[in-house]
Amino acid sequence: MKLSTQTEYLGARFGEAEAIRMIAKAGFDAFDLSLFYMNSQPQHPMNQSEFREYAKSLRAVADECGIKCNQAHAPFPTSVGDEEKDEAAFALVVRAMEAAAIVGAEMIVVHPKHHLSYRTHARELEELNLAFYRRLLPYCEQFRIKVACENMWQHNREAGRIIDSTCSRPQEFLEYLTKLNSPWIVACLDVGHTALTDEDLPAFVRTLGKTQLQALHVHDNDLRADLHTMPYMGKIDFATFTAALKEIGYEGDFTFEADQFLAAFPDPLAPAALDLLHKVGRHLKTQCE
């Protein structure tokens, strides 16, 4: 099990190459390449014709630092309900898959479509998503990279609270994967999202099981908002979570998505904050093994 964290905040602040160097220097085994800026930043290097060369340059930095890209995160949202925009989003996901594979990732997290109200359109969303992930399969085989579906949430603006969305319930998530029936499509369990939708986190782990659960997004929150902060800064019970991972014999990596913790610190303290995140990760990782 590798200990990993994402490049998102450090990459935006210091550049992606330097983010990789910082993550390696802090002692992490791997990094999660954040590619979700591709849909909001047309000038991003991954959106240019030379994106393959840029991806190779990041791979060279990683190799020089002795660190691996264990997974990546594709651009999102993957749908807004407009055919032209959704096709453009699909093309970005495919490009992200290729770029991630070049950098060395064996897996990329791809959000399911959930632009419709889940409460009234759950079946329609399921049909859209099964077609969406099946459409990605040829690219999985071409680039030799797995796609990890993630459990989501929606926001009820009228009530001012978070509610269920695609794959937020463990049985539904498992049914998605069973129907897709491909070794290329697996589960990424977002720990924070699970807490926000009132799910029993250890039970979610056990329901997905060792075969389907192959990636994690680990972060903490106050059970009310998607804070993406470091474990032990919020209210999630990480002792029962790590015990469940150990129980099922989890064989994936332990990947943080806790960059809002890092965001609170000024530049000179970023390495120290990253070092603390690493130490917390090592502690949690030992509880899983």
Across the structure, where does each feature detected by a protein language model lie?
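Active-site-proximal loop/turn and secondary-structure-junction residues that shape catalytic pockets
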Residues: 9-11, 35-37, 75-78, 112-116, ...
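Residue-level preference for nonpolar/small residues embedded in alpha-helices
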Residues: 15, 54, 92, 131-132, ...
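Active-site acidic/histidine proton-transfer and metal-coordination neighborhood
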Residues: 56, 60-68, 78-186, 196, ...
